[in-house]
Amino acid sequence: MIDKTQYRKFYKNIRNSIQHDVVLNKSRLICNELKMIEEVKHSNAIFVYLSYGKEVKTDEIIQYLLSKGKKVLVPKCNIDTETMIPVEIIDFSQLEIGSYKIREPIVSNEYFGRIDLAIIPGISFDRFGNRLGHGKGYYDKFLEDTNICKIGLCYSDCLSDKKIPCQDTDIPMDYVITDREVLKLWFFILTVHFAKLKFCEMREGEIC
């Protein structure tokens, strides 16, 4: 069985091989698809990752959300605890190069209000909504015990037809958007969740 490390190396190599102009074009297509998602249209406060390297670019997404009067929240990382907090921004001048050489807010004023939706990066996703990140668990910790609509972005080249190995702490996405398709996964996730609950009810005394 292929483990996460092998998957990560495989899809990193694929992503790194994509030419810069192709990255920009694919990112634009993904942004256009994202704008059409009903949950995006009706959300007020939206958490968005700040793209770097060959990740799906999010600057256009952020500009669009700000133009629509949305609260835009971006991550501020703490490398000691490997956690992050959401910080509201109103323009890109509020950013600096921070942890891991990724842009992040200059200030650390954590946003404590309701977050309706989160836009999440991934090296790869599969068709079940499972995510392959860098292995630090920042996003899984951030999304734990939340009821946020989660949208993962990746290139079609990095969408896995095979199930990505996952653990109980890994948080699945409600949507995965690529430059070729939009996967709406919340129904699948709910079905699996209720099937698990039903299975546990049938096994008296089992803790699930």
Task: Give residue spans per PLM region.
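Flexible, active-site-proximal loop/turn residues at the rims of small-molecule/cofactor binding pockets
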Residues: 52, 124, 182
